[in-house]
Amino acid sequence: MAGLAPEGSQFDDKQYDKKMQEILTEDFFTSYDDVCESFDSMGLQENLLRGIYAYGFEKPSAIQQRGIVPFCKGLDVIQQAQSGTGKTATFCSGILQQLDYGLVECQALVLAPTRELAQQIEKVMRALGDYLGVKVHACVGGTSVREDQRILASGVHVVVGTPGRVFDMLRRQSLRPDNIKMFVLDEADEMLSRGFKDQIYDIFQLLPSKIQVGVFSATMPPEALEITRKFMNKPVRILVKRDELTLEGIKQFYVNIDKEDWKLDTLCDLYETLAITQSVIFVNTRRKVDWLTDKMRSRDHTVSATHGDMDQNTRDIIMREFRSGSSRVLITTDLLARGIDVQQVSLVINYDLPTQPENYLHRIGRSGRFGRKGVAINFVTRDDERIVFDVQRFYNVTVEELPANVADLL
């Protein structure tokens, strides 16, 4: 699979590296090289430390060692690290350290691309700030506007949300921006893509001119970095080069499948062979989610499914069942990949390969969370060879053929 580029390969890694190098050599960033190897050495409030340790953290991850303190100092930051390395706790800690808890007004706004991810951030923020008495609320689509207005009127310190609902709350003046001093974009590559870019600008225009901005993502294409220049002031750059994006701890394999129609049999064979704690299966369309779910259930496999056409309440119930372990197999699409944070996921299967190399990391980063071992298996037809080639070049990894002893790896 790692030979010459297949005909029609779209990804130009030389052009990517050239654009990235141009941006990184410009006098746009502030250098910051301090590393804190323990949470105790970061100068954090005692009650924040209590929340961090109660959450289960013992030692800061690499991004936390470098990223929490500059954010706590009020500096603009751009931080890039692999999914599952503690980015969320990095900016949550930075926000919680700086809040004025005597002022029950929104002081920090966090935007995420999906409802599930926004709700996940809300949970982390609330857990880390448990001993501080933080008031945090998620403003997301698919929930009651009136309830959002009621909670915001009663007073919150932090709002986490999706761009559409947050902009609506600002426009209705239910969310007052006067005291917002911190603005965070999570999964910024997605947030700064064409779909969200205009909404982000519209929201930013309504915020105070003097505001701290944090940009966090697993991947940071040059286009996203260029956009950040419009609303950041000499940010601290904690940026991993593309060839340093680690997928360490996640073993990656491919299975050659001659025909699309044979994927289903291959998948069912795998599930009959392997003892799996929990797994996520990715396909590329909502219709395919429904189709594959029906096919697997008809063969007596217990699976759950979630996609953007389902109402929010149904998706919440399904994700709760999956997190609790009562459901062990989840079929979903890229849209919801970023809201899945389940520690026990040991296997990700790309039934369909992602159309963009950047999405590969977001998908397989669902396994091997926080240093645990994980396995990713990619179903590859002849039409998919170009995508696998692009992924290998993009992340500087080798995807090997699935060995016969795959059961020993899980």
UniProtKB/Swiss-Prot annotation:
GO terms for cellular component: cytoplasmic stress granule. Keywords: ATP-binding, Helicase, Hydrolase, Initiation factor, Nucleotide-binding, Protein biosynthesis, RNA-binding. Gene3D superfamilies: P-loop containing nucleotide triphosphate hydrolases (3.40.50.300). It catalyses: ATP + H2O = ADP + phosphate + H(+). GO terms for molecular function: ATP binding; ATP hydrolysis activity; RNA binding; RNA helicase activity; translation initiation factor activity. The keyword Acyltransferase does not apply. ATP binds at residues 81-88. SUPFAM superfamilies: P-loop containing nucleoside triphosphate hydrolases (SSF52540). It comes from the Eukaryota. CDD domains: DEADc_EIF4A, SF2_C_DEAD. GO terms for biological process: cytoplasmic translational initiation. PROSITE patterns: DEAD_ATP_HELICASE, HELICASE_ATP_BIND_1, HELICASE_CTER, Q_MOTIF. It is an enzyme of class 3 (hydrolase). Transmembrane segments: none annotated. A motif (Q motif) lies at residues 37-65. A motif (DEAD box) lies at residues 186-189. PANTHER family: ATP-DEPENDENT RNA HELICASE DBP3. Belongs to the DEAD box helicase family. eIF4A subfamily. ATP-dependent RNA helicase which is a subunit of the eIF4F complex involved in cap recognition and is required for mRNA binding to ribosome. In the current model of translation initiation, eIF4A unwinds RNA secondary structures in the 5'-UTR of mRNAs which is necessary to allow efficient binding of the small ribosomal subunit, and subsequent scanning for the initiator codon. eIF4F is a multi-subunit complex, the composition of which varies with external and internal environmental conditions. It is composed of at least EIF4A, EIF4E and EIF4G. This is Eukaryotic initiation factor 4A. It comes from Zea mays (Maize). The lineage of its organism: Eukaryota, Viridiplantae, Streptophyta, Embryophyta, Tracheophyta.
